[in-house]
Amino acid sequence: MDIVSLKFIGVGLMAIGMYGAALGVSNIFSSLLNAIARNPAAAENLQRMALIGAGLAEAIGLFSFVIAMLLIFS
């Protein structure tokens, strides 16, 4: 295998990071809806914490995407 083939395999593996971020965000908001359904009075506090968690999970996916683009175009 040459170096170009290995670069594209690495980019394909970076998709796992983006897949994990998508699963994390969906899990966060699924849990948020369940928690708000159980305790509507705490909705504001729960929503704030969920958005912070979703932002952190999404950042991992964006870092993975940036690294994949660096691998492709370098």
Swiss-Prot record:
Write down the membrane topology: Multi-pass membrane protein
Main location, first listed in the record: membrane
* Origin species: Rickettsia canadensis (strain McKiel)
Query: Its function?
Result: F(1)F(0) ATP synthase produces ATP from ADP in the presence of a proton or sodium gradient. F-type ATPases consist of two structural domains, F(1) containing the extramembraneous catalytic core and F(0) containing the membrane proton channel, linked together by a central stalk and a peripheral stalk. During catalysis, ATP synthesis in the catalytic domain of F(1) is coupled via a rotary mechanism of the central stalk subunits to proton translocation. Key component of the F(0) channel; it plays a direct role in translocation across the membrane. A homomeric c-ring of between 10-14 subunits forms the central stalk rotor element with the F(1) delta and epsilon subunits.
Outline the subunit composition: F-type ATPases have 2 components, F(1) - the catalytic core - and F(0) - the membrane proton channel. F(1) has five subunits: alpha(3), beta(3), gamma(1), delta(1), epsilon(1). F(0) has three main subunits: a(1), b(2) and c(10-14). The alpha and beta chains form an alternating ring which encloses part of the gamma chain. F(1) is attached to F(0) by a central stalk formed by the gamma and epsilon chains, while a peripheral stalk is formed by the delta and b chains.
Per its UniProt record, what InterPro entries does this chain match? ATP_synth_F0_csu, ATP_synth_F0_csu_DDCD_BS, ATP_synth_F0_csu_sf, ATPase_proteolipid_c-like_dom, F/V-ATP_Csub_sf
What this protein is called in its record is ATP synthase subunit c
Give UniProt keywords alphabetically: ATP synthesis, Cell inner membrane, Cell membrane, CF(0), Hydrogen ion transport, Ion transport, Lipid-binding, Membrane, Transmembrane, Transmembrane helix, Transport
PANTHER family noted in UniProt:
ATP SYNTHASE LIPID-BINDING PROTEIN, MITOCHONDRIAL, ATPASE PROTEIN 9
Instruction: Tell me a Gene Ontology molecular-function term this record carries.
Output: proton-transporting ATP synthase activity, rotational mechanism
GO terms under cellular component: plasma membrane; proton-transporting ATP synthase complex; proton-transporting two-sector ATPase complex, proton-transporting domain
Indicate where this protein resides in the cell. Answer: Cell inner membrane
Q: Where are the transmembrane segments?
A: 8-28, 52-72
Which Pfam families does this one have? ATP-synt_C (PF00137)
Coiled-coil segments: none
Q: Which domain of life is it from?
A: Bacteria
Report disulfide bridges, numbered on this chain. Answer: none
Name the residues annotated as site: Reversibly protonated during proton transport.
58
Recorded family membership: Belongs to the ATPase C chain family.
